[in-house]
C-alpha cells in the first residue's frame, strides 16, 4: 500500500542527503530494459545493489515490478562472484521529496485475483486477459533461500508488502531520519500469513509482532531497533556507506561458511525445505573431499572403493 504522502519520510534536503553514491557503482550488463528496478554492482566489492525505482508512488510494486525484481535477484543468486545483495529503494519522490524503501503492492491495480498487469496506473488500464498475481511471495522465498546474504537498507517507508520484504531479508539497516515501518495489511483487507508475520514474531516476539499487525501503527527506526527487527540505525546520508561496510565484512569471510550459516539459521523455521537446502550444501562439501572422489572414481572404474584411508570420525 502507498503510504500517505503527508506523513513522515519527507525530506526538505532530499537530494543533498541521498545515500546513493553513483561513483561506487556500475550498472550490471544485460539489464538495460529495466524500468521499475535498478541493478548495480559495486566497483570493487562482491556486492550488488537492487533498488525499487518508482519513488513517485513510494516504490509501491506492480506485477511488472515484481517480474523485474525476481529476475535481478535470481541473477545475483546465480552469480558466483556475488556475496551480498543490498536491497533498497531509489528516491526521493519527485512529487514531495519523500523517501521510501517499498510501500507494498500498488492498490490501484489490485483485483480480486491479485495484483493485475496494466498498461497504466489505474483500474481502467488493467489487462483483463491476464490473471492477477501474488508473486511477491516468490520473491520472499527467493530472498530466503538464495545462498547470499541479503541486507535491506530501509531509507524511508517500509509498509505492507514492503514491510514483509524487510522482515525476510537476513539483515536490516535503517535511516535514522526517514525510515518508517508500518504494517498496513489489515487496513486494506490483506494479510501476510507467512514470513511477513511468523518470521517477524521470531525477531520481535509474539506480543510485538501482533501489535505491529493488529494496530498498524507507524514505528521509527529506533523503535524497530529496540524491538529487534532492525540491526542498526544509520544517518540517512550514510546508510548505503554503512551497508557497504557491512557487506565488505561479510565478503571477507568464507563463502562456503556464510552459505552454511544462512541455511543453518533458516533450518528450524523452514522445515523439510530448510533441511533440503542445508543438506544440499553439505553434499557439495562432501563432493570436495578425497573420500567422495574415491567413491565416484571407483564407480566409473568398475572396482570396489577403497575406504581404508578415510577415518570414521566421532
Swiss-Prot record:
The record marks 115, 185, 287 as: Important for catalysis. Coiled coil: none annotated. Substrate binds at residues 58, 95, 103-107, 115, 157-161, 184, 190, 287, 302. It is an enzyme of class 4 (lyase). Signal peptide: none annotated. Converts o-succinylbenzoyl-CoA (OSB-CoA) to 1,4-dihydroxy-2-naphthoyl-CoA (DHNA-CoA). Belongs to the enoyl-CoA hydratase/isomerase family. MenB subfamily. This is 1,4-dihydroxy-2-naphthoyl-CoA synthase. The gene is menB.
Amino acid at each position: 500500500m502507498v503510504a500517505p504522502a503527508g506523513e513522515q519520510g519527507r525530506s526538505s534536503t532530499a537530494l543533498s542527503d541521498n545515500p546513493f553514491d553513483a561513483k561506487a557503482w556500475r550498472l550490471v550488463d544485460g539489464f538495460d530494459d529495466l524500468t521499475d528496478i535498478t541493478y548495480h554492482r559495486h566497483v570493487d566489492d562482491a556486492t550488488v545493489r537492487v533498488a525499487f525505482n518508482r519513488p513517485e508512488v513510494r516504490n509501491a510494486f506492480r506485477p511488472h515490478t515484481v517480474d523485474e525484481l525476481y529476475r535481478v535477484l535470481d541473477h545475483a543468486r546465480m552469480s558466483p562472484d556475488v556475496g551480498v545483495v543490498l536491497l533498497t529503494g531509489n528516491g526521493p519522490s519527485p512529487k514531495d521529496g519523500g523517501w521510501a524503501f517499498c510501500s507494498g503492492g500498488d492498490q490501484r491495480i489490485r483485483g480480486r485475483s491479485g495484483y493485475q498487469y496494466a498498461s497504466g496506473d489505474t483500474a481502467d488500464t488493467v489487462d483483463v486477459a491476464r490473471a492477477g498475481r501474488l508473486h511477491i511471495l516468490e520473491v520472499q522465498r527467493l530472498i530466503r533461500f538464495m545462498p547470499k546474504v541479503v541486507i535491506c537498507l530501509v531509507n524511508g517507508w517500509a509498509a505492507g508488502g514492503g514491510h514483509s520484504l524487510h522482515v525476510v531479508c537476513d539483515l536490516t539497516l535503517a535511516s535514522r531520519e526517514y525510515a518508517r515501518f508500518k504494517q498496513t495489511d489489515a487496513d486494506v483487507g490483506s494479510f501476510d500469513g507467512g514470513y511477513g508475520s511468523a518470521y517477524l514474531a521470531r525477531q520481535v516476539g509474539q506480543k510485538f509482532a501482533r501489535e505491529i499487525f493488529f494496530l498498524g501503527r507507524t514505528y521509527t527506526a529506533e523503535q524497530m531497533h529496540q524491538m529487534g527487527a532492525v540491526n542498526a540505525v544509520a544517518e540517512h546520508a550514510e546508510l548505503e556507506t554503512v551497508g557497504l561496510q557491512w557487506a565488505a565484512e561479510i565478503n571477507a569471510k568464507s563463502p562456503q561458511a556464510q552459505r552454511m550459516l544462512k541455511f543453518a539459521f533458516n533450518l528450524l523455521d523452514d522445515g523439510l525445505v530448510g533441511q533440503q537446502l542445508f543438506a544440499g550444501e553439505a553434499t557439495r562439501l562432501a563432493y570436495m573431499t578425497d573420500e567422495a572422489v574415491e567413491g565416484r572414481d571407483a564407480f566409473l572404474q568398475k572396482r570396489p572403493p577403497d575406504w581404508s584411508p578415510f577415518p570414521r570420525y566421532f
